[in-house]
């Protein structure tokens, strides 16, 4: 009863009124992810740097004692399951080529901020743990690594690799940041990159990702 009441309260507040804590932020994230899937044909709609934009809510609630690490891990495990639930119909050839019905929802953990400081945090570790717990192909978990990555984080990522699930994918900041700068990004924007879909490094919030736009702008052959 209390759980459902809290869920109803969360849904009444977000995303319209903005999240006030980690639990509400998780609910808001899930609403937005579903809306984007529906609006944009549901392919490669990637959560990006989940551990970064969710961390302020986590930190605030942990300091006030509203949440525990165990509760946060449970919420993240649930989000991972829900992300794997999302699907879209494909023809047989596409299903075979994509090794199933993956939606390539890339979620990346670790890395550095715009000032070049490593920002691996508790949620970075919990992201890996969530994939360990649910053992599902979605979200497509990735990790950012560089010479400032904590050794413990590399070990934890390697433990997930050892399971054979094919996660996480590893992305080297030392190579990707200069490559993005060579394409016109500022150093600050390049440091804040995330991965879209399979392997595409892009800057959060500054890349147009509306992949089905031609469905609306191009004339239909049937017209």
Language model: regions and residue ranges:
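Conserved catalytic cores of very large enzyme subunits
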Residues: 2-218, 222
